[in-house]
Amino acid sequence: MPDYRSKTSTQGRNMAGARALWRATGMKDEDFKKPIIAIANSFTQFVPGHVHLKDLGQLVAREIERAGGVAKEFNTIAVDDGIAMGHDGMLYSLPSREIIADAVEYMVNAHCADAIVCISNCDKITPGMLMAALRLNIPVIFVSGGPMEAGKTKLASHGLDLVDAMVIAADSTASDEKVAEYERSACPTCGSCSGMFTANSMNCLTEALGLALPGNGSTLATHSDREQLFLTAGRTIVELCKRYYGENDESVLPRSIANFKAFENAMMLDIAMGGSTNTILHLLAAAQEGEVAFDLRDIDRLSRKVPQLCKVAPNIQKYHMEDVHRAGGIFSILGSLARGGLLHTDLPTVHSRSMEEAIAKWDITQTDDEAVHTFFKAGPAGIPTQTAFSQSTRWETLDDDRENGCIRSFEHAYSQEGGLAVLYGNIALDGCVVKTAGVDESIHVFEGTAKIFESQDSAVRGILADEVKAGDIVIIRYEGPKGGPGMQEMLYPTSYLKSKGLGKACALLTDGRFSGGTSGLSIGHASPEAAAGGAIGLVRDGDKVLIDIPNRSINLLVSDEELAQRRVEQDKKGWKPAEVRPRKVTTALKAYALLATSADKGAVRNKAMLEGL
């Protein structure tokens, strides 16, 4: 029977000093026999997805203590990608994922905590905490802050989100008044941005991995139903502790739950719902932390057989996360995948003995449970607020239309191939990724002329100066994990291409990455990256590039001999940008770049460089 990890600091004569300090935090004699459960919160006033989390850690703490545990809360950092975007702040976004993972490890191991409740929400916070959970492999449960309500304005017939505000701002034909109206309407409440962007994608994937409660990814941040998720998480983590430490039940540990099959389930969900390409990066990173042999080839394999069953902004303007919830949330998509014979349903979760059991209970098309139906009727109130659980609005009906609704059956899928694809070729030998859900079918095969930019900044200037024409393939390089450093998101270049009317007339290829808000023929994560000697660094202005999504290929139409000669020349010059970039690369960023791997490895640290230390 495993001992509580916390016994290291709570038991024995020699730990009198440690116990004295524990007592100073409020612990009593009886508490030293209970599991100490860390609450990793990520409250910050910088991020709308986290601004409402301040008191939620203590909400969970009280429930943990009622259930027989001792709760100790700490905080991690959280970067807002939208606010950090378009300037050097974006250099820090992806590196913050590693800092968050380390922070959770540091706090949990330094204080010998027995389990963790991860209160996350936005882009790098959920992945960072997931990496830590799989690294530590002690009982864990995730509960996120929830999605924002979609914005509303009389100037648009559809719901708004952050991307709408960015696109309209770049449209030279839009009046200042229209831009101001979109700006004030796009992000009306607390919560993670309302489309299927990175934050919401990752929170949905924690459900598929089995590490979060049903509704975690889709219940609105403002809705009173979300409070119950936090309360249930507090009770559940104590139960998981009892099963592991009291009954030696290792099936409750993160690596037992989030195994190879669970990672396949998560990736199949991502493909089926057209999630952010960033999720590929983060799943690969989490798999490495959990020592799961899941890689880009597995994602490529799955992308060829999973249909797209859900389409949400930015891939379609009609639906946002509140509509996914009304259609039954993530377990309705998982149910469709299960009935299609794809999902692994024999896996345990933190809340059910098996995924099959959970689907039977939570898929609205399979259950008559009125409480479940009521839960998924939770909807938006349309009232601007930064307060969690502040409204109890419900839809009159559910969206259970699997032919024409937000979530579809296999027979009525949006497309028979899913919303994400991995491409390989001489320009990306280790692969690159594209969100096909956001690509118009007319350009699934695209041959274009390379237009080279050595940074995101120069690409933005070129696009706005009309240097990019229809038929061009914008190449933005030296923006990978090592070359950026930090692998910036390219939402501004894609938004500006869209505002220039080039969304269906151009492509963009980069060793950087894309926001979950990106759509269009935007191909990222080109690996190896330019700074690591990748062939994207050998492309020249005027070269022809052929993109073929159906055949999963991307090739520079240059002979092998010519590429070899260019490589010799580039080796002599060094693999660095041809232009001087006015960005300040600090010691912190240099330290990140030193150990960073390319995107096909999840941009995690190169552990081989640390061997022997």
Curated annotation (Swiss-Prot):
SUPFAM superfamilies linked: IlvD/EDD N-terminal domain-like (SSF143975), LeuD/IlvD-like (SSF52016)
One of the record's GO molecular function terms: dihydroxy-acid dehydratase activity
EC number: 4.2.1.9
GO terms for biological process, alphabetical: isoleucine biosynthetic process; L-valine biosynthetic process
Active site as annotated: 515 (proton acceptor)
Pfam families documented for this protein: ILV_EDD_C, ILVD_EDD_N
Cofactor detail note: Binds 1 [2Fe-2S] cluster per subunit. This cluster acts as a Lewis acid cofactor.
InterPro entries tied to this protein: Dihydro-acid_dehy_C, DihydroxyA_deHydtase, DiOHA_6PGluconate_deHydtase_CS, ILV_EDD_C, ILV_EDD_N, IlvD/EDD_N
Binding site for [2Fe-2S] cluster: 122, 193
Pathway noted in the entry: Amino-acid biosynthesis; L-isoleucine biosynthesis; L-isoleucine from 2-oxobutanoate: step 3/4; Amino-acid biosynthesis; L-valine biosynthesis; L-valine from pyruvate: step 3/4
Catalytic class of the enzyme: lyase
Catalysis performed (reactions): (2R)-2,3-dihydroxy-3-methylbutanoate = 3-methyl-2-oxobutanoate + H2O; (2R,3R)-2,3-dihydroxy-3-methylpentanoate = (S)-3-methyl-2-oxopentanoate + H2O
Keyword annotations: 2Fe-2S, Amino-acid biosynthesis, Branched-chain amino acid biosynthesis, Iron, Iron-sulfur, Lyase, Magnesium, Metal-binding
NCBIfam families found in the cross-reference section: ilvD, PRK12448.1
Function field: Functions in the biosynthesis of branched-chain amino acids. Catalyzes the dehydration of (2R,3R)-2,3-dihydroxy-3-methylpentanoate (2,3-dihydroxy-3-methylvalerate) into 2-oxo-3-methylpentanoate (2-oxo-3-methylvalerate) and of (2R)-2,3-dihydroxy-3-methylbutanoate (2,3-dihydroxyisovalerate) into 2-oxo-3-methylbutanoate (2-oxoisovalerate), the penultimate precursor to L-isoleucine and L-valine, respectively.
Record-stated family: Belongs to the IlvD/Edd family.
Subunit structure, as described in the record: Homodimer.
Protein name according to UniProt: Dihydroxy-acid dehydratase
Organism: Pseudomonas putida (strain ATCC 47054 / DSM 6125 / CFBP 8728 / NCIMB 11950 / KT2440)
Gene: ilvD
